[in-house]
């Protein structure tokens, strides 16, 4: 059983929940968060226990790990919303993550769910994890995108256009002139579709993401992660997918 960590262990008995404050502000402020030697993920204790048992400090270390390892823009993340235990963190929905961290929220949610399902093995192959996350995540959330921090707090999904893989697939289905027989509807009303030309789809997505090494195996792995978020639903047929309850824009009467 982990030692319990009270709110006063790291924080003063004053209200600090400023909506504009990022968690990195507190990492750099010893009044709130005493300095500690940063460890690599595999050397850190929090990586060896289930996220539900993380203390608040472990949650902070996890956030720092995500920003360092996957080049997330820390200015997007509101520390106020992550001053919680691991159990509370695991109880957050994807929508709550996006409310707390803007476009980075979906990225953080995906990483957490991967750690919960894979355990310590998640940290054994960081390059493979990065490749999968790159296929899945919103690239506008990366530091290298040059996006301004205030833009990270805009939660409008319409501005993302086709930066997500599932949106790219949706838009391709809705654009016969660009589709070229790569995808086809099996049941338009139910949102069920089939990948007809798998490698052509992977090549087209790779060109958009400037990734010459994209394969359908990698692309399909990224698509399967959408099962966890309700964007796609599993269909027990090869190369067949279905839009889920959290997908939008594919219905004919809601375009």
Swiss-Prot record:
One of its GO terms (molecular function) is sequence-specific DNA binding. SUPFAM superfamilies: SAM/Pointed domain (SSF47769), Winged helix' DNA-binding domain (SSF46785). It holds the Pfam family SAM_PNT. It comes from the Eukaryota. Residues 33-119 form the PNT domain. Residues 163-244 bind DNA. SMART domains: ETS, SAM_PNT. One of its GO terms (cellular component) is nucleus. GO terms for biological process: cell differentiation; regulation of transcription by RNA polymerase II. Keywords: Activator, DNA-binding, Nucleus, Transcription, Transcription regulation. Transcriptionally activator that may play a role in regulating the later stages of keratinocytes terminal differentiation. Binds to DNA sequences containing the consensus nucleotide core sequence GGA[AT]. The PNT domain acts as a transcriptional activator. This is ETS-related transcription factor Elf-5. The lineage of its organism: Eukaryota, Metazoa, Chordata, Craniata, Vertebrata. The gene is ELF5.
């Amino acid at each position: 059983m982990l030692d319990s960590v009270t709110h006063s262990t790291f924080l003063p008995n004053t209200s600090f929940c400023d909506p504009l404050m990022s968690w990195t502000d507190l990492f750099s402020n010893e009044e709130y968060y005493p300095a500690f030697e940063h460890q690599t993920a595999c050397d850190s204790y929090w990586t060896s226990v289930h996220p539900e048992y993380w203390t608040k400090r472990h949650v902070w270390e996890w956030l720092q790990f995500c920003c360092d390892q996957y080049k997330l823009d820390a200015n997007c993340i509101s520390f106020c919303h992550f001053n919680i235990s691991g159990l509370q963190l695991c109880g957050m929905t994807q929508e709550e993550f996006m409310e707390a961290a803007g476009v980075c929220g979906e990225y953080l949610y995906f990483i957490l769910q991967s750690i919960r399902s894979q355990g310590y093995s998640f940290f054994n192959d960081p390059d493979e994890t990065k490749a999968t996350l790159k296929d899945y995540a919103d690239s506008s959330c990366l530091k290298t995108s040059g996006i301004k921090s205030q833009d990270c707090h805009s939660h409008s999904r319409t501005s993302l256009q086709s930066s997500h893989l599932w949106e790219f697939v949706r838009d391709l289905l809705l654009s016969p002139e660009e589709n070229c027989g790569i995808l086809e509807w099996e049941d338009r009303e139910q949102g069920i579709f089939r990948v007809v030309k798998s490698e052509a789809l992977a090549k087209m997505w790779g060109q958009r993401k400037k990734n010459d090494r994209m394969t359908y195996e990698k692309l399909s792995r990224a698509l399967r992660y959408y099962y966890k978020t309700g964007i796609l639903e599993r269909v027990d047929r090869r190369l067949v997918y279905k839009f889920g309850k959290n997908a939008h824009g594919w219905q004919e009467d809601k375009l």
